[in-house]
Structure formats: structure tokens, C-alpha cells
Regions:
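Contiguous beta-strand/loop segments that form the cofactor/metal-binding neighborhood of enzyme cores
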Residues: 1-47, 77-91
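Short polybasic amphipathic segments
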Residues: 31, 47-61
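C-terminal "lid/loop" region of Rossmann-like NAD(P)-dependent oxidoreductases
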Residues: 62-72
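Short, well-ordered coil↔helix boundary/capping segments
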Residues: 70-77, 94
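C-terminal helix-rich "cap/oligomerization" subdomain common to oxidoreductases
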Residues: 82-114
């Protein structure tokens, strides 16, 4: 069965689910944002294809459905480049250890493992 967590915020709600163990689930990673004025779906994440479906035009995006493709990239290359620079003392990490700990604690609490 899919794993599910609901995170509530002041002005938003996040529903996170993992269907990796679900029979017939898609093998690709995806990310979807549902809002009051439309949706944005990134599926598959690699190579990136973003589909907007908007109730009204917003910025450079027209009303209705449209697809935006992104150039292919190699996952983790930039992450390892940043990590190497941090290990060498050339720059701090973009995400602090406190932020990483907060993410891990949130996931554990959402799974009932607090």
C-alpha cells in the first residue's frame, strides 16, 4: 500500500505519498502542486517535463494546459560538487545540518516514529 503523510501549515497543506511498494505503480519520480488557481506537475522528474494547468494566465504562462521541457541533467553532480567545496572549506553547504535534521525528524514524526 502507498505510504502517506499530511503536513498542515497556516495557508497550505502538503500531502506526501510514496507508491514504490504499490502494485502497478509508475517507476518514475514525480512532484505535483495543486493550488486554487491550477496545478503544476513535474513528471517524470528526469528528464524534466513540467505541465501547468491554470485557471487564469499567470506571469508568462497562459490559461489552460501547457508543457515545458527542461534539458537533461545528471542528478547529484551539482550536489557532490557543492559537498566537495564544503569539505575543502571553500563554501558552506546550502542546507544547514539543522535544516537536514528538521527534515529527518518531520519524516519520522509523519511516519509515527517520533
Amino acid at each position: 500500500p502507498p505510504l502517506l503523510a499530511v503536513l498542515e501549515f497556516d495557508r497550505a497543506r502538503a500531502v506526501l505519498f510514496n507508491t514504490a511498494l504499490q502494485a502497478g505503480s509508475t517507476p518514475q519520480r514525480s512532484f505535483e502542486v495543486l493550488g486554487t488557481k491550477g496545478t503544476a506537475t513535474l513528471a517524470p522528474i528526469e528528464p524534466g517535463k513540467l505541465i501547468f494547468n491554470l485557471t487564469d494566465a499567470a506571469g508568462p504562462y497562459k490559461k489552460g494546459s501547457q508543457e515545458i521541457s527542461f534539458p537533461a541533467y545528471k542528478r547529484y553532480v551539482d550536489d557532490f560538487t557543492e559537498l566537495a567545496a564544503a569539505v575543502r572549506g571553500e563554501q558552506p553547504l546550502t542546507v544547514s545540518l539543522d535544516e537536514e535534521l528538521l527534515v529527518a525528524e518531520t519524516v519520522l514524526r509523519a511516519c509515527g516514529m517520533s
